[in-house]
Amino acid sequence: MTLGDTLFTLVTFLVLMLAVGKVAWKPVSKMMADRQQKISGDLDYAEKSRKDADALAAKRQEELQHSQADAVKIVNQAKENGEKQRQSLVDAANAEVTTMKKNAQTDIDQARKDALASAKNDVADLSLTIAQKLIGKELNADDQKGLIDDYIKRLGDANGSH
C-alpha cells in the first residue's frame, strides 16, 4: 500500500466516521440511553413491587396472628359463658330441689297434723262413747275436753317412750 492509498483510506475513514457520527451515532446513543433508562425503571419497579409484596405479606401475617388471637379469645369466652350457663342451671336446679324439699316437708308436717287432729277427733268420739257406756251418762264439754286431753297425753307419752 502506498502513501496515497493510506492517506485516501484514512481520509475516507474519517469522513465515514463523521457521517456515521452525525447520522447514526445520535440515534444509536439515544436508543441505548432509552434502553438503559427502561432497564433501570424496570429494576426500580421490580424492587418496589418486591417491597410492596413483602409489606403485604407482613401485613397478612399480622392479620393472621390477630385473627388467631381473636379466635382463641372467642373460644375462651364461649367456654366461660358455657360454664356460667352450666353453673346457673345447676344453681337453679339446686334451688328447685331445696324448694321441693321444703314443700314436701311442709306437706308432711300438715299431713301429720291433719292425721293427729283426725285421730284426736276419732279418739274423742270413741272415748266419749266408751265413757257414756261405762258411766251411763252424758259428759259436758269441759269434762269431755279434760278426758280427751288426758288420753292424748298418755297416748303421746306411750308413743314417745318407744
Curated annotation (Swiss-Prot):
InterPro entries: ATP_synth_B-like_membr_sf, ATP_synth_b/b'su_bac/chlpt, ATP_synth_F0_bsu_bac, ATP_synthase_B_chain
UniProt xrefs under PANTHER family: ATP SYNTHASE SUBUNIT B, ATP SYNTHASE SUBUNIT B', CHLOROPLASTIC
Keyword Transmembrane helix: yes
SUPFAM superfamilies membership: F1F0 ATP synthase subunit B, membrane domain (SSF81573)
Role description: F(1)F(0) ATP synthase produces ATP from ADP in the presence of a proton or sodium gradient. F-type ATPases consist of two structural domains, F(1) containing the extramembraneous catalytic core and F(0) containing the membrane proton channel, linked together by a central stalk and a peripheral stalk. During catalysis, ATP synthesis in the catalytic domain of F(1) is coupled via a rotary mechanism of the central stalk subunits to proton translocation. Component of the F(0) channel, it forms part of the peripheral stalk, linking F(1) to F(0).
Main localization (coarse): membrane
Species of origin: Lacticaseibacillus casei (strain BL23)
KW Translocase (keyword) present: no
Subcellular location: Cell membrane
Family: Belongs to the ATPase B chain family.
Cellular component annotations (GO), alphabetically ordered: plasma membrane; proton-transporting ATP synthase complex
Membrane topology note: Single-pass membrane protein
TM helices/strands, residue ranges: 6-25
Molecular-function annotations in GO: proton-transporting ATP synthase activity, rotational mechanism; proton-transporting ATPase activity, rotational mechanism
Protein known as: ATP synthase subunit b
Complexes and interactors: F-type ATPases have 2 components, F(1) - the catalytic core - and F(0) - the membrane proton channel. F(1) has five subunits: alpha(3), beta(3), gamma(1), delta(1), epsilon(1). F(0) has three main subunits: a(1), b(2) and c(10-14). The alpha and beta chains form an alternating ring which encloses part of the gamma chain. F(1) is attached to F(0) by a central stalk formed by the gamma and epsilon chains, while a peripheral stalk is formed by the delta and b chains.
Keywords: ATP synthesis, Cell membrane, CF(0), Hydrogen ion transport, Ion transport, Membrane, Transmembrane, Transmembrane helix, Transport
